[in-house]
Amino acid sequence: MVYNFSMANKKTVSQNYVKKQFSIVGIALMIYALVVIFMPIGAKISVENGLFPRMDNPKLSFIISFIGLIIGTVFPFMIVRRVFGTNLKEFTKKTEIDLSDYLINFVVYFGFVAAALYVNTIITKLLGVQGIMLSDVGIVFNEILVDSPIYLFTFIFLSPLLEEYAFRGVLLNSLSKYGRYFALMMTTIVYTLAHASISEMIPSFVMGYLLAKMTLTYKSIRPSLFTHIMGNALLCAFALVPEKYSIFSLVFIAILLILAIILVFSKKYNIISIGSSDSSKRAIKFFLSNIFVIIALLLFVMHTTLITLLKF
């Protein structure tokens, strides 16, 4: 049976039209995976095998990854934006949100993300999997080099900026035309799989879900960008805490988590509720059955497997 799809603007489009748009998304994600995700692995292997003997190994690998992160993110998602006719200016506009709302959103975000990161780390240890505690899409850190301004700039500012542009500014905004629930879930799944480490799967899902809901609530990526940057900065701050004082970090995270739970069940956490619908469920099935989307997701899974096996 052939279905027509109802878009958010009440316009009805054919299944072939939707297939073409979803195929473009899949192809863009494939390009993103091949350039942004696999380039660091290729650079590391090439440098370690002496193909560039005159260059310092870590620096060269990072420079190649840095360039790939920018090009591989901007180019494919620019294609998606043009095909969908997505107005990025509308999603980068100022919002009617005050400082108290920013702080509430951040406490909820970081409380749940930090707790998820801690739980996921325990699970990976029980499974005997060597997890990378802190990483970001495209560039993986075996440890946060807090004495390196370039690493810090990338982790705290560049990665959040590119991720919010790509996943919330372009992908979420574009897919929202077929329903907010559909866009929320698909963006969250893609964002989760795009992360490199098994030890980040649960926190990445929490991050993607909360940042996407925040963006849909305020119809702008500014709140999510601010929250993302502050979250990464605080993670770097935790990296500075000596191991013998790590108990204080856990206590701080526990307090934030309790406060986050209280805020969620109070009326102060003003995040919209997004329910599923038959059209969203149909769009999800159609999206996940697209061959290009499937290949892109498999590339993400393959990358995670390689990272785990190679202990990159």
Where are these regions (language model features)?
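Short, positively charged and aromatic/hydrophobic N-terminal segments
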Residues: 3-4
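Interfacial transmembrane-helix boundary/kink motif in multi-pass membrane proteins
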Residues: 8-33, 57-59, 86-117, 275-298
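Membrane-helix interface linkers and caps
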Residues: 8-13, 51, 63-110, 125-127, ...
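Membrane-interface segments at the starts/ends of alpha-helical transmembrane spans
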Residues: 18-24, 51-65, 138-146, 238-251, ...
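Alpha-helical transmembrane spans of integral membrane proteins, capturing the lipid-embedded, hydrophobic core
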Residues: 25-40, 66-74, 102-114, 118, ...
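Alpha-helical transmembrane segments in multi-pass membrane proteins
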Residues: 33-83, 249-255
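Juxtamembrane helix-loop-helix connectors linking adjacent transmembrane helices
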Residues: 52-61, 89-159, 305-312
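Transmembrane helix-loop-helix hairpins at the membrane interface
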Residues: 149-308, 312
